[in-house]
């Protein structure tokens, strides 16, 4: 049963990241790809888990650079990383803070439950709520980048997202060897939520 939950979790994770990617990049994704892409990713995870795990972090960057070859690499990297990082941040925020308010504790990533899938499916609506509340417009980022307003800021954001990805992955991979890995991951999550949304 745990394997089924795990596969459904990864399927829903890719689905949510695709929705986030389309929202911020304004690149249309055909509805069929919302079915095929998560399925192919789950298949890759079954065949070769390490490749599937690391491909998750870089597939959207590679896709963006391939599709927009003659446009800014910094913007392509931003569009590739942002959905993955925001999915991770908001998912952990829901798991660490919102669900415990409801009496549901899902701190341990080693044991999965149906709540993990529910959390994943709530990430996109939660992101929409934050974007609407803060009145964020991703088209303004694109326009500002064309005029060189955000170039260095976006470079710093990309570096910070890569650092987040590296730190969280390290704590997940070495959770058995590092004392208080879950607590440190929570602190990193808090810091990056403040950095991204405040």
Where would I find each of the regions flagged by the language model?
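Juxtamembrane segments at transmembrane-helix boundaries
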Residues: 2, 7, 15-29, 47-178
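Hydrophobic, membrane-inserted alpha-helices
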Residues: 14-18, 36-44, 58-63, 192-197
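Transmembrane-helix signature of polytopic, membrane-embedded enzymes
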Residues: 29-35
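Alpha-helical membrane-embedded segments
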Residues: 122-125, 189-197
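Membrane-interface helix-start motif
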Residues: 176-188
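Signal-transmission coiled-coils
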Residues: 182, 197-198
């Amino acid at each position: 049963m745990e394997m089924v939950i795990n596969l459904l979790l990864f399927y829903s994770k890719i689905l949510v990241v695709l929705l986030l990617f389309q929202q911020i990049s304004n690149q249309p994704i055909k509805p069929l790809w919302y079915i095929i892409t998560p399925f192919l990713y789950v298949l890759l995870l079954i065949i070769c888990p390490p490749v599937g795990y690391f491909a998750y972090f870089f597939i959207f960057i590679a896709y963006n650079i391939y599709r927009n070859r003659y446009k800014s690499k910094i913007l392509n990297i931003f569009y590739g990383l942002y959905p993955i990082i925001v999915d991770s941040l908001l998912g952990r925020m829901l798991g660490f803070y919102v669900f415990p308010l409801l009496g549901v504790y899902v701190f341990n990533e080693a044991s999965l439950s149906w709540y993990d899938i529910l959390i994943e499916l709530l990430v996109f609506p939660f992101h929409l709520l934050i974007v609407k509340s803060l009145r964020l417009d991703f088209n303004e980022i694109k326009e500002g980048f064309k005029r060189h307003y955000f170039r260095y800021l976006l470079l710093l954001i990309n570096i910070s997202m890569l650092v987040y990805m590296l730190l969280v992955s390290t704590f997940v991979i070495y959770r058995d060897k590092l004392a208080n890995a879950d607590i440190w991951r929570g602190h990193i999550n808090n810091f990056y939520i403040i950095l991204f949304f405040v």
